Amino acid sequence: MESGPAIGIDLGTTYSCVGVFQNGKVEIIANDQGNRTTPSYVAFTDSERLIGDAAKNQVAMNPTNTIFDAKRLIGRRFNDSSIQADMKHWPFRVINKDGKPMLQAEYMGETKTLSPEEVSSMVLTKMKETAEAYLGKKVTSAVITVPAYFNDAQRQATKDAGVIAGINVLRIINEPTRAALAYGLDKKLTGEKHVLIFDLGGGTFDVSLLAIDDGVFEVLTTAGDTHLGGEDFDNRLVNHTSLEFKRKYKKDMRTNPRAIRRLRTAAERAKRTLSSSAQANIEVDSLFEGIDFYTSISRARFEDLCSDLFRKCLEPVERAILDAKIDKKKIDTVVLVGGSTRIPKIQKLLQEFLNGKELNKSINPDEAVAYGAAVQAAILSGDKSDEIKDVLLVDVAPLSLGIETAGGVMSKIIERNTRVPTKASQTFTTYSDNQPGVSIQVFEGERAMTKDNNRLGQFELSGIPPAPRGRPKIEVSFDIDANGIMHVTAKDESSGRSNKITITNDSDRLSKDDIDRMINDAERFKAEDDAQRERINAKNQLEGYAFNLKSAVDDAAAQSKLSPGDKETVTKAVNDVLQWLDSNSLADKEEFTYKLEELQKTCSPIMAKMHAGTGGPRGGGPQGFPSGGAGGPTVEEVD
C-alpha cells in the first residue's frame, strides 16, 4: 500500500476525531459506521477486542471489561485525588502498579493488565485505520492533540501512546490552538483580532486567548482544568437519579455496575436533550431487580445539580484574560469548542461574564480540533498549498518551570504563558562550603514551594572544585522544544563540567522496554483481531452454504430432479452441519473450513446432477448452485 498524507487526530476523553488536509481543504473522516466522531472506548470479550462504536454499543452487557476515560488516567499517579474520585464512577478495575494506575479486563479467559497509554494507543490505531480506509493509502505520520493545560508527563504519555500505535508522531499540540486555526482559516480574518477559545469537552477544559493577524496565530495565554467536562455533568445526573431510585424503591442499585452503566447512558441522552428542551425523560426498563425506572428532569434542576461546576468554567477564562493583561472589551470573538459548550447555561454564564459578547458558534465544536490538527500535520509534512503556506502558529508553555532551591523554594526559570519553543537560563550557587555537587530537581507549577508543584525529574552535577559557599557559579538552562518537551542543562562555570536531562524518562513514564513490549502486544492484539475476523468469515461461509443447500433441495422445482435417496443425503448432511454449528460456534477457522469442504464433497455432485437436469444457472442462490463463499453472509453484513 502506498504511503498517504499525514493526518490530524483529536484524541478525546469520550470521543475522538480524525482529519486530513488534501486538495486544498480539510476533510473530517467518517468511520466504518458513518460517524465523524468515534467513541474513545475499548472492550474485551471472551472472543474478541472491540474499539469505538462497537465497544460503546455493548457496554451495558459488559461494563467491567469496557474501558473508557483513558485520557483521565494518562500521565497521572494512582494516588492522584482526581483518579480516586473517578474510580467511584468507573465500572472497570483500576489497580496500583508502582504508583501508576493500570487497567484490568478479562480477555479470552485471562486477565489483561493494561496501561492508559496502551488503551489510548488502541483508540489511535482505530483512528489511523479509519483514515487509511478512506484514503486507500498507508498512514504513518500524525499530529495528536492534547489539552493546553496537560502537564509534561501527560504530554509524554500521549506521545508514547502514538508510538505504541505505530504512528510517527510529528507533534503533540494544544487543542484550543488547533480550534483557533480552524476558525481563522474558515473565516479568512483580516487585521489583528483577539480570539478567545472556550473548549469544554467530555473530560477536559481549556481556555486560550490568541492574537490572530494575517495567518499568524499567536497564543497569548492559556488556562484550564484537565479534569472538568461533560462526564462530570453525567456523574451529577447519575448520582441524583440513583438516589431517587433508592428513595422510591428502598433499594440501592449503585453496587451493580450494569445497572449504573444503563442509567449513565440514559442520563447522557437526557443531558443532550436538555440543551434543546426544557425537560427530558429518563426511562430504563428492568433497571435493577426487575424494576422499570422512569423519571423526568427539568433543565432548571439539571442546572442546579451542576451549578458549581458550571461556575468553575469561568475561573480559567478570568485567569487567561488577566494573564494577557487585556481588557475584556478588547476580545473580538469568543469561539465555542467541545460538545459540552452546547449547554445553554454555560453559554449564558460565559456571555454574561464577557459583558454580553456574542458567542461564535460557526465551527463544528466536535470537529474543530481535528480540523486544526489536520492543517498542522500538512504544514509539518511540507505541504505548500496556497491555503496554508502563510500560516504560522506560536504556542505557549501552560505552566511555569523551575528548580528547587534551598528550603524547598520554587525558583522559576520559565514563566507560564512564555512562547515555545524557548530557552532561558539562570545562575545559582552552592548552599554550603566545599560542596562537591548539586542536585538539580525540576518542577512545573505556580506555587511558591516545590512540594505543592509537580516534580518532573532530577539529575546530579558533581565534581565542583572546593570553594566557600556562594562562590561557585552554576548556570541552569531550560530549553523547551516545539512539542512542549523540555531539556535541562546545568554547567559549573569554573570547571566547565556539565550534565543534562531530557524530561522524558520521568518515573511516571513508560520505559523504552515497556513501550517495545506494548508495541509487540499491539501487534499481537491486531493479529488476534484479524484471526477472529477470518474465523467468523469461515463460520458464515459454512452456515450460508448449508442454508443455501437446504433451500435448494426444499424448492418445488428440485423435487422432480432429485431422487429421494439424494434428497435424504443432502438433508442429513445439512442438518448434521447445522447441529454441529449450534454446539461449536467458537470452533477454529480450520474446523469451519474442513466442515465446508466435507459438505461440498458430499453435496456438490448431487447438486450438479440436479442442475444438469434443469439447465439452470450455476450462480449462488436458492435455485442456483450454492457457492462456498458468496452465498452466505459475510462478516461485514452481519451485525
UniProtKB/Swiss-Prot annotation:
Residues 609-639 are annotated as: Disordered. Gene3D superfamilies: 1.20.1270.10, 3.30.30.30, 3.30.420.40, Actin, Chain A, domain 4 (3.90.640.10), Substrate Binding Domain Of DNAk, Chain A, domain 1 (2.60.34.10). Keywords: ATP-binding, Nucleotide-binding, Stress response. This is Heat shock 70 kDa protein IV. The gene is HSP70IV. Belongs to the heat shock protein 70 family. Transmembrane segments: none annotated. Pfam families: HSP70. InterPro entries: ATPase_NBD, Heat_shock_70_CS, HSP70_C_sf, HSP70_peptide-bd_sf, Hsp_70_fam. CDD domains: ASKHA_NBD_HSP70_HSPA1 (cd10233). GO terms for molecular function: ATP binding; ATP-dependent protein folding chaperone. The keyword tRNA processing does not apply. Residues 613-632 have a biased composition (Gly residues). The keyword Zinc-finger does not apply. It comes from the Eukaryota. It comes from Paracentrotus lividus (Common sea urchin).
